[in-house]
Amino acid sequence: MYNILISAAAAVAVLVILLLVKLPWWAGLLVALALFGGLFVLLSRITMKKVMAIIETAGKDLQGQRFEKAIRELKDALKYGKWQIYVNGQLNSQIGMIYYMKRDFSNAFPYLEKSFFKNWAAMGMLAICYMKRQKKDKMVATFEKAVMGSPKESLLWNLYAYCLNECGDTTKAKEALEKGLKKLPGDAQLKENLENLQQGKKLKMRSFGDMWFQFHLESMAAIQKHQMAAMGGRMQRRTVVRR
């Protein structure tokens, strides 16, 4: 990463100069370390400011349904990955998620594979890709990495359990929900779905709304039916208010 290398080179150069002018080695080292830290923070902020500006522009394009333009902008920002640590992972997460939400799973997969592990939604999508490719071991490993990075996400634990249950491993699905409850004591959705599995029922995920539907684990017909039911409920509430 260029920012680290530049900061380290500057620190070493200053250390050498200070040693040549007979400054005690420990004092020179302290100055060099301070320079390294300060310069690295400064360069990182400059780089991230550029990256965030591109992400903000891409976000506006997404809101305007200009998906391909947003993807091009994010891909262009990958050049900053050489400068700053974790930038590539964050950008690959965003690109992969856009492709995935467009149902372009083949293009989404290679970007999701390079996702930042703390982007739990991208990691969830990657795990689902492994599940659909009949790679259960990789699915489990991906979910384990995701819950380690984002242990307080209720949907992530429920999604993990859902996929395990879909793979026919109800016991492991229950264990995932139990682990989730240890991280999120009293979480209503985790408790409800654990009870559902214990009673031999299906997991209920629709209460998560659009956050759940973005994973495309339900058919379009089921999603449309849910949306129509929700629309009908809103219309009934409006009618009651008018009365």
Can you annotate each of these PLM segments?
Residues 51, 57-59, 89, 95-96, ...:
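Conserved small-residue packing positions in alpha-helical repeats and bundles
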Residues 81-155, 159-162:
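Alpha-helical adaptor scaffolds
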Residues 172-243:
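Long, non-transmembrane cytosolic or organellar matrix-exposed soluble domains/tails
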Residues 148-186:
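Compact, basic/aliphatic-enriched, mixed alpha/beta core segments that act as assembly/interaction modules
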Residues 73-75, 105-113, 137-150, 171-180, ...:
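Alpha-helical repeat scaffolds
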Residues 24-30, 36-106, 111:
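N-terminal topogenic membrane-targeting module
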Residues 1-50, 222-243:
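Helical anchoring/docking segments at protein termini
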